[in-house]
């Protein structure tokens, strides 16, 4: 029987499946951070259980860390306790930890791929909703809760029901300057923020194949923002070339054998999906969210929509509420909306290609008066590479703040946050009310678009910036 990529990955990991019971899946990789793991380790300790496979468990610090100092005390008492607990737990249970002073420390979904922890064909979990990022490699990756974190630590397995399947095909080639962030925001704009609920999404089509691995990670990172369980891109030569030579990747003949298997990780011809969505890449322009969920998104050249234009009463009410929170009036051009802060970073857009794209816009320009702009590399290796390329100097000369790795202003769990009423052009993944700080107003954009907003003081079409 013809199978989708998701069905192949799922079936290959079923340990046990009884009639009328949820299947038990084997988990190949477990990524751990300081926020969702303390209670899970406490549970192991209370029952006298070890970590079943510490060699398949990798930990780092990211959510609570300061991006201005490596001082564990910098972000308050709760952050300090969570980080100290992670240090203690990893030492006690034999788990590898990339702590604040480790050169590989960074956002968990940046660290995993760049160290070769993430490989095609794997099941990967983490107590974090954006674990879908790793699906870019053709791995089945999804976020789990703290009780499930404990279960995986103890057993290296997890009960999981089968999801529905969705194919999202982006046909043709994207225009120059259109990034994976624009593509995924356009997709969510079409499906809505709940359009993928109950599904695992496979992204395909020429525009997806053209993306680098970093672009594919951006794409899969935001699958959760359309309600999907996970996002997938089938592995190909782009994937294999990215993985080759990385720290935890197979070497020599093992790598060749792995590629032979990875090449089978494609949806079979004739396999059927429960839902199919199609977009034309050439129609996608630079995207900016205007509301309080990622599906409330328009082209940078559009006007703020009028709630009255929504036929669905629920969407209309949602738009009215969003505009009130965001302090926006219907009908005004998006390019006239001024911003207070810019955040370039997060597990969505903090990799080297993202920083290069932002630096290209920033080079030779200055951050607009009254705007604070942060650039937060996703990991120690990303920061080191950016500095080797001189990107830090470009940003600093333009008036951006060059920070240490961490989740930073993506979420208000550390010192980087918005004040009430402040408006931010952000390369992160969520624009919910209060996500970046109580009363903060978040607009999701690509790194180049964020840099353009920083130097102009308002949203601007990067295609017009020469």
Swiss-Prot record:
Family: Belongs to the aconitase/IPM isomerase family. LeuC type 1 subfamily.
Enzymatic class: lyase
Pfam families, sorted: Aconitase
Enzyme Commission number(s): 4.2.1.33
Protein name according to UniProt: 3-isopropylmalate dehydratase large subunit
Superkingdom: Bacteria
Cofactor (UniProt): [4Fe-4S] cluster
Positions with a binding annotation for [4Fe-4S] cluster: 347, 407, 410
Record carries keyword tRNA-binding: no
Catalytic activity reported: (2R,3S)-3-isopropylmalate = (2S)-2-isopropylmalate
Function: Catalyzes the isomerization between 2-isopropylmalate and 3-isopropylmalate, via the formation of 2-isopropylmaleate.
Metabolic or biological pathway, per its Swiss-Prot or TrEMBL entry: Amino-acid biosynthesis; L-leucine biosynthesis; L-leucine from 3-methyl-2-oxobutanoate: step 2/4
InterPro entries given in the database record: 3-IsopropMal_deHydase_lsu (IPR004430), Acnase/IPM_dHydase_lsu_aba_1/3 (IPR015931), Acoase/IPM_deHydtase_lsu_aba (IPR001030), Aconitase_4Fe-4S_BS (IPR018136), Aconitase_4Fe-4S_dom (IPR036008), IPM_dehydratase_rel_enz (IPR050067), IPMI_cat (IPR033941)
Signal peptide start and end residues: none
Note describing how the cofactor binds: Binds 1 [4Fe-4S] cluster per subunit.
Record has Plastid as a keyword: no
Disulfide feature: none
Assembly and oligomerization: Heterodimer of LeuC and LeuD.
GO molecular function terms attached to this record: 3-isopropylmalate dehydratase activity; 4 iron, 4 sulfur cluster binding; metal ion binding
Gene Ontology annotations of biological process type: L-leucine biosynthetic process
Keywords: 4Fe-4S, Amino-acid biosynthesis, Branched-chain amino acid biosynthesis, Iron, Iron-sulfur, Leucine biosynthesis, Lyase, Metal-binding
Gene: leuC
């Amino acid at each position: 029987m013809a199978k989708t990529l998701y069905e192949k990955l799922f079936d290959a990991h079923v340990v046990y499946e009884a009639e009328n019971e949820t299947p038990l899946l084997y988990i190949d990789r477990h990524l751990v951070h300081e926020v969702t793991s303390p209670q899970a380790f406490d549970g192991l300790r209370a029952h006298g259980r070890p970590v079943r496979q510490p060699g398949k468990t990798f930990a780092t610090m990211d959510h609570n860390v300061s991006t201005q100092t490596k001082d564990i005390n910098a972000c308050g008492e709760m952050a300090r306790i969570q980080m100290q607990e992670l240090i203690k737990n990893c030492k006690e249970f034999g788990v590898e930890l990339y702590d604040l002073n480790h050169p590989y420390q960074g956002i968990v979904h940046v660290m995993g791929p760049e160290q070769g922890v993430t490989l095609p064909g794997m099941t990967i979990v983490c107590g974090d909703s954006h674990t879908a990022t790793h699906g870019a490699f053709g791995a089945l990756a999804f976020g789990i809760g703290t009780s499930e974190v404990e279960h995986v630590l103890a057993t290296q397995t997890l009960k999981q029901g089968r999801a529905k399947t969705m194919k999202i095909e982006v046909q043709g080639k994207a225009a120059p300057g259109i990034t994976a962030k624009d593509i995924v925001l356009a997709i969510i704009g079409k499906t809505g923020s709940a359009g993928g609920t109950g599904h695992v999404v496979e992204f395909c089509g020429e525009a997806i194949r053209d993306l680098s691995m970093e672009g594919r990670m951006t794409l899969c990172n935001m699958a959760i923002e359309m309600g999907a369980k996970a996002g997938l891109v089938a592995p190909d030569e782009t994937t294999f070339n990215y993985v080759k030579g990385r720290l935890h990747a197979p070497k020599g003949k093992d790598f060749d054998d792995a590629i032979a298997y990875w090449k089978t990780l494609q949806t079979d011809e004739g396999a059927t999906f429960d839902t199919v969505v199609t977009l034309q890449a050439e129609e996608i322009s630079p995207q900016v969210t205007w509301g309080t969920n990622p599906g409330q998104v328009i082209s940078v050249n559009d006007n703020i929509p009028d709630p009255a234009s929504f036929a669905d009463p629920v969407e209309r009410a949602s738009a009215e509420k969003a505009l009130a929170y965001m302090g926006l009036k219907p009908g005004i051009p998006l390019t006239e909306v001024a911003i207070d802060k810019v955040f370039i970073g997060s597990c969505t857009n903090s990799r080297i290609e993202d920083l290069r794209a932002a630096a290209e816009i920033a080079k030779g320009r200055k951050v607009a008066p009254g705007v604070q702009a942060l650039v937060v590399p996703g990991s120690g290796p990303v920061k080191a590479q950016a500095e080797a390329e001189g990107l830090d100097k470009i940003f600093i000369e333009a008036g951006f703040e060059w920070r240490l790795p961490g989740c930073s202003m993506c979420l208000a769990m550390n010192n980087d946050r918005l004040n009430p009423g402040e408006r931010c052009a952000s390369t992160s993944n969520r624009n919910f009310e209060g996500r970046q700080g109580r009363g903060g107003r978040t607009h999701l954009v690509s790194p180049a678009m964020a840099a353009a907003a920083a130097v102009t003081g308002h949203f601007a079409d990067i295609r017009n910036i020469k």
